[in-house]
Design a protein with these regions (language model features):
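Cell wall/extracellular polymer interaction/catalysis modules
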Residues: 1-120, 128-146
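A conserved hydrophobic position in a structured secondary element of the catalytic/binding core
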Residues: 125
Length: 146
C-alpha cells in the first residue's frame, strides 16, 4: 500500500498539479537522516541528509530546476531536512530528470508516510515497507507507476 498525489495520476504532469506522473522511471540514490536512523541495508548509494540540502522546484531557474541544491534563500526549493519524518528516507524518482523541462514537475520522490495522506505528487510508504523494498532494489531498478 502507498500514497500518491492528492489529485491522482497523470500522463501529462505539470508543476504544482498535485499529481503523480505515470510511467516507468529509474530511481536515484537513497537520502536518509542519519541523526534519526542507522544507514539502511541497501545496495543503493546512501547519502546523509544535512540541514543545507534542498531540491529546486523553481521552473524559472533553468540551471537548478529539479536538482539537489545547497539551500539558498534566492532559489525556490523543497527542504530535505525537515522536522517531520517524511524525508527521513527519500529516493528521487528520475522524472523530468535528464532533459529537464521547466514546469513539467519536480521533487518527485519516494518518501515516508505515517497515515497514507495524499502527497503533492510523490509516492509515500510506511517506513517498515520502504525498508523492506530498500533491501530488494538495486541501482538499475525501475519503478512503474500506473
Amino acid at each position: 500500500k502507498c500514497s500518491i498525489g492528492k489529485n491522482g495520476l497523470s500522463k501529462s504532469k505539470i508543476e504544482g498539479d498535485l499529481k503523480t506522473p505515470v510511467g516507468i522511471f529509474s530511481i536515484e540514490h537513497l537520502y536518509y537522516r542519519n541523526d534519526r536512523m542507522e544507514k539502511p541495508i541497501t545496495t543503493l548509494k546512501c547519502i546523509k541528509i544535512d540541514k543545507n540540502m534542498g531540491w529546486c522546484d523553481d521552473p524559472l531557474n533553468k540551471e537548478k530546476y529539479n536538482k539537489l541544491i545547497k539551500v539558498n534563500k534566492k532559489i525556490k526549493h523543497e527542504k530535505l531536512y525537515r522536522r517531520d519524518h517524511k524525508y527521513d528516507l527519500l529516493i528521487p524518482i528520475k522524472y523530468n530528470f535528464v532533459k529537464r523541462v521547466a514546469g513539467k514537475g519536480s521533487c518527485i520522490f519516494i518518501h515516508l508516510t505515517k497515515n497514507y495522506a495524499p502527497t503533492a505528487g510523490c509516492i509515500a510508504l510506511k517506513k517498515k515497507d520502504l525498508l523492506i523494498i530498500l533491501k530488494l532494489i538495486k541501482k538499475n531498478t525501475k519503478i512503474k507507476i500506473y
